[in-house]
């Protein structure tokens, strides 16, 4: 099998690392690394829901994505300074939110909001897929936090795992997990979000420099789903460790029974 510039096989992921408890304040905080792409994903629990959600008894999950100015080779100004959020930033923020809402029962968290913030520290391709994969782990930790605080009506509101990976056609070959060097010249570029139950959440795919047949689409999806299976295992290993911070006490603990009562 032909090797790539970084030495990987076509169907091989970059080295993926997930570090929980990366920062101490949010309920969930993760550093996810796909090779040289590094994204900090946090999950914060906030009381209340958006105005249009009030009175429904349902919670909400929202996401924001951003890149640090020096995340790429050429510094890009902060969008907050420019006073306008770019279209790409909005698109990726919505993708992350949609992807993670697919795995959680929002009725179980009551009228509370889980806010996911994904900040790219260093970009080398696949930032949105790394963000989705890391945000899932941060979300699981946030749910653990809510459970400890006795704020869940269902102790297991997460129904499945969520991971995402990029895949594309480069030099006429289907390749998994594209770094920037490949992504920038791919003939076909695709991002796939999947569940660990074998279903798909979202597919974003375009022919950048060429059209492609249905048979290539099938190969792209097969490669992406195989990659996601590996990511699910990496997530499970990361989550097998204890919660990395201090869990809250229940807000309304049951009164202790008197001895002999």
Swiss-Prot record:
Cited PROSITE patterns: RIBONUCLEASE_PH
Biased composition (Basic and acidic residues): 251-261
GO molecular function, one term: 3'-5'-RNA exonuclease activity
Superkingdom assignment: Bacteria
UniProt key word Metal-binding: no
Reaction catalyzed: tRNA(n+1) + phosphate = tRNA(n) + a ribonucleoside 5'-diphosphate
Gene3D superfamilies according to UniProt: GHMP Kinase, N-terminal domain
E.C. number: 2.7.7.56
Region (Disordered): 242-261
GO terms (BP aspect): rRNA catabolic process; rRNA processing; tRNA processing
Positions bound to phosphate: 88, 126-128
Keywords: Nucleotidyltransferase, RNA-binding, rRNA processing, Transferase, tRNA processing, tRNA-binding
SUPFAM superfamilies from the UniProt entry: Ribonuclease PH domain 2-like (SSF55666), Ribosomal protein S5 domain 2-like (SSF54211)
InterPro entries noted in UniProt: ExoRNase_PH_dom1, ExoRNase_PH_dom2, ExoRNase_PH_dom2_sf, PNPase/RNase_PH_dom_sf, Ribosomal_Su5_D2-typ_SF, RNase_PH, RNase_PH_bac-type, RNase_PH_CS
Function: Phosphorolytic 3'-5' exoribonuclease that plays an important role in tRNA 3'-end maturation. Removes nucleotide residues following the 3'-CCA terminus of tRNAs; can also add nucleotides to the ends of RNA molecules by using nucleoside diphosphates as substrates, but this may not be physiologically important. Probably plays a role in initiation of 16S rRNA degradation (leading to ribosome degradation) during starvation.
Similarity comment: Belongs to the RNase PH family.
Assembly: Homohexameric ring arranged as a trimer of dimers.
Alphabetical list of HAMAP family matching this protein: RNase_PH
The name this protein goes by in its record: Ribonuclease PH
